[in-house]
Design a protein with these regions (language model features):
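Active-site core of metal-dependent hydrolases
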Residues: 189, 195-299, 317, 322-324, ...
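Divalent metal-dependent hydrolysis catalytic cores, especially in the metallo-beta-lactamase
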Residues: 108-134, 148-159, 181-193, 220, ...
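Metal-associated gating/positioning segment near the N- to mid-region
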Residues: 74-143, 205, 228, 233-236
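C-terminal cap of metal-dependent C-N hydrolases
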Residues: 352-354, 358, 371-413
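Short, acidic/polar
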Residues: 107-115, 165-178, 225-230
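Histidine-rich, glycine-flanked metal-binding segment
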Residues: 25-28, 37, 41-77
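His/Asp/Glu-enriched, well-ordered alpha-helical/loop segment
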Residues: 99, 216-218, 286, 297-383
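Active-site gating/metal-coordination segments in enzymes
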Residues: 156-208
Length: 413
């Protein structure tokens, strides 16, 4: 990881030299005029203005001026949050996942590119779960040295197999190790991949230890779980269940009663694997049998999202599981949820705004357009409530008061 930091430093130098191309930052006060504004919590405002000072929103005032950015005619909303991504995954020089023969420098460039295209797609915060190489990328972006979304990382996940798995005490030690390595959240695999059948890989006792230790350290827990592992993760007190395919309605009701978040993936990740089958097949963990299983999983995912959406009080957040081939296309998951699962478009938007922020413990900082929140603001050419494909047309991106994308005309003082 030390050499990865060196390579990212090289990228930083290049970014600093080219910064006027990538970002437009106005010191002091910025006023954005909007015609249609989604506040991130389900409310729509019309014909108003957003006032920003530094990195924060300080007012919503229809009389504020002068206007710096005129976004009337567009749909303005908080920057999206992807609760489940793998920002360092990329295809290598051989075209394959993981990239046999790829140098550390090439991996660092690819990670920086993934971060950039994700930001350009309107995602101003992501949870990358996880890889140790997330850490230097997260830190470079947080310091403003590289452009990209705000990153929360799990560093190294507890896999449920191999050397990380052991007694409850050994698992607690592993969780502490991730905290020391800079983890923002803990990722736990309680099930095998759905490509290997999705069977449970941790006992209830092991899950209890992992989730309890994380809680003692002030860390949230995301648990990769299918079938019976969904209930086990919920009983263990995890923060969020990832995937959740084949969970029963009773499992989902238990999650709602416990306040456990659900992060299902309706389509993008499976569609991406199938689209890039030749680039994954034969790499570790990707077999012909696994792809046959994935071809059957989409209807199951759609069924889960439909059923989960009907469970009162169940908090469903937006996560894509974006891997190599999907970075920058994260918003396709919105289309899958609305088109294939019948999710209300505004519910889909808030799942990637205030609800995802709440799941990350950042509900008072990001995910809403209101005074006191980070100025993470995007604009779409179109209205996603009428045409969900508008999520593909992100024409303006601001993160923390810095404008990184501005395709509409700009009004300057």
């Amino acid at each position: 990881m030390r050499f990865m930091k060196f390579v990212l430093l090289f990228l930083v130098i290049n970014f600093v030299l080219a910064k006027p191309i990538f970002a437009q930052h106005k010191q002091g006060r910025i006023v954005i005029a909007v015609g249609t504004l989604f506040d991130g919590k389900g409310k729509v405002l019309h014909n108003t203005r957003i006032v920003i000072e530094g990195s924060k929103i300080v007012a919503i005032d229809p009389k504020a001026g002068p206007v710096d950015y005129d976004l009337k005619g567009l749909t303005v909303l908080p920057g999206w949050i992807d609760a489940h991504a793998h920002v360092t995954w990329s295809f290598g020089p051989d075209g394959k996942n993981g990239g046999a023969g790829r140098t550390t420098a090439e991996a660092a460039y690819a990670a920086a590119e993934n971060a950039w295209v994700t930001l350009m797609a309107g995602f101003t915060t992501i949870q990358s779960v996880g890889s140790p190489t997330d850490v230097p990328l997260r830190d470079a972006i947080a310091k403003g040295l590289l452009p990209g979304p705000r990153i929360l990382t799990a560093v190294e996940p507890l896999t449920g197999r191999g050397p990380q798995t052991g007694t409850p005490d050994e698992i607690r030690a592993f969780i502490r190790k991730q905290k020391d390595a800079g983890a923002d959240v803990i990722k736990i695999f309680a099930s095998a991949s759905i490509r290997q059948g999705g069977g449970m890989t941790l006992s209830q006792e092991q899950l209890n230890a992992a989730c309890d230790e994380a809680k003692k350290l002030g860390l949230r827990t995301l648990v990769h779980a299918y079938k019976e592992a969904v209930r086990a993760a919920t009983i263990a007190g995890c923060t969020q269940v990832e995937h959740g395919t084949l969970a029963t309605d009773d499992d989902l009701k238990l999650m709602a009663s416990k306040g456990t978040f659900l992060d299902p993936q309706a389509g993008l990740v499976i569609e991406n694997y199938l689209l890039n089958k030749d680039r994954y097949l034969g790499t570790p963990g990707y077999t012909a049998e696994g792809f046959a299983a994935m071809e059957k999983i989409l209807p199951m995912n759609h069924d889960l999202v439909r059923r989960a959406s009907k469970i009162p009080g169940l908090r469903i957040v937006f996560g894509t599981d974006a891997v190599a081939g999907a970075h920058g296309r994260n918003a396709e998951e919105f289309i899958d949820r609305v088109r294939d699962c019948g999710v209300d478009p505004m519910v889909a938007m808030t799942s990637a705004n205030s609800l995802a922020a709440d799941a990350m413990g950042l509900g008072s900082q990001i995910g809403s357009i209101a005074p006191g929140f980070e100025a993470d603001i995007i604009a779409l050419d179109g209205d996603p409530l009428k045409d969900i494909t508008a999520v593909r047309r992100v024409v303006f991106v601001m993160k923390g008061g810095v404008v990184y994308k501005n395709e509409p005309h700009e009004v300057r003082r």
